[in-house]
Amino acid sequence: VHCKPRQIGDSTVGNAWNFSYGYRCLDPIRTLIMANDADATDSLFRCLKHFHDSLPSVLKRPLKRSNRKELEFADTGVIWRCLTAGGRGQGRAWTHQRLHADEVAFWPNDESVWASVTSTLHEGPHKQIFVTSTPNGPGGLYHRLVMQAMADPATCFRFFRWADHAAYRMRPPADWEPTQEEADLASLHGLDILQLYWRHQKIWGGQGI
């Protein structure tokens, strides 16, 4: 379970991990990739297809199918399927060994979708669930999964601070001064003035949240 800021490439990492696993696997495993909306589903499928298309010709496994948000190897029968949370079916007609649940905090009907997709998972040596999302406030499925992951030694939980990423910085005007609350946050979390102003703009700026 990963808790992350936006646009650090974590969804791509999850996609790459599942593609690498499926590429090396000789069993006909199926991986379900579930995104929060149609645009994200399209993006994840394009990323998956790019991994295959970018391989040297000598390393490319032959494809049986590469359409309808599905990628299937002809030789091993390995399949990746990309679906949108809340869409028709939720993959219930299939059995999967692996699940990449992306941006879970923004899934519509999150608990219902989660119950549906996890019921398709086959218990066995290939089973793995990879959950990644930007937080969306307390409560809901993703908050529950994070709290469970933090308490469960059998689950790998990773928290990625936005302040650890160089893109989240903005130079303030010369006359800008942080509020006392912002100064306290800077002291508590070790933020510099560029990070603090970036945060300020994201909350109070014209293009912020």
What residues fall within each predicted segment?
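Phosphate/NTP-binding elements of NTP-utilizing enzymes
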Residues: 1-209
